[in-house]
Amino acid sequence: AGLDSKLYTKNALKKGAKVVKDHIFGATAVGEYIESFITNALFEDIGNGDVTSLATINKEQTGEAVFYVKEDCVIAGIDLAKMICNQVDPLLSTFFNFSDGEFVNKNTSIGTIKGSIQSILKSERLLLNCMQRMSAIATKTNYFVHLIAPYNVKILDTRKTTPNFRICEKWAVKIGGGVNHRFGLYDQVLIKDNHIKASGDIKKAIESCSDYLKSKNLQIPVIVEVKNLEEFNRIKNYRLLTVFWLIILNQKLL
């Protein structure tokens, strides 16, 4: 049966919020963030109207779209797809046979959308773009998660994301079994080589960071990248630091 659109949207927004809630500094409304993304993406694609569909399809005409996967994958973006459909037309009914994070074999039907053909075609491209990209990220993430399973390590994401699509790409990493790192420049301190060079010294960078956080009464994670074990040993006893990233350049760990 079709899902109640308004009820589903609230639940889906909560699920999306769980992905990044620990990385949003200052109580950012994640649900509004996702809704805003959908609104802007739809306007980018539709503008003032889908002129081809408006010109060729009766607005009362209804139909059904069936979605298949072209490759084996970890499916991702189903919750987002339902939110997109709801925002385009609350009367669209969505029926999906899988949930985000499930493995799907090639050529499998994952679900259908029923309702106004004009509405289906307006939502189709954004829906497919998001699901294809998110599923690719989730699948690749899942591959590496299984690859490192014997070791006590985790796969983290980065800020190297598609502009204005970060929340969905990090969502996909989470779906694939990875761990979300900082969402932006505001929710964690990450002292890297550029900061160290500008400060003149790794200890100076850390001390300046400590002074700044105290002056602003900020309690957020502090991470520092070190390029060798010598740098690591110099700063390992700083209580301010919560995590170390050991980046060894041009050397083999094993």
Task: For each feature predicted by the language model, list its residue ranges.
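Low-complexity basic/metal-binding stretches
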Residues: N237-L254
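Acidic/glycine-rich phosphate/pyrophosphate-binding loops and surrounding catalytic core
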Residues: G2-Y238
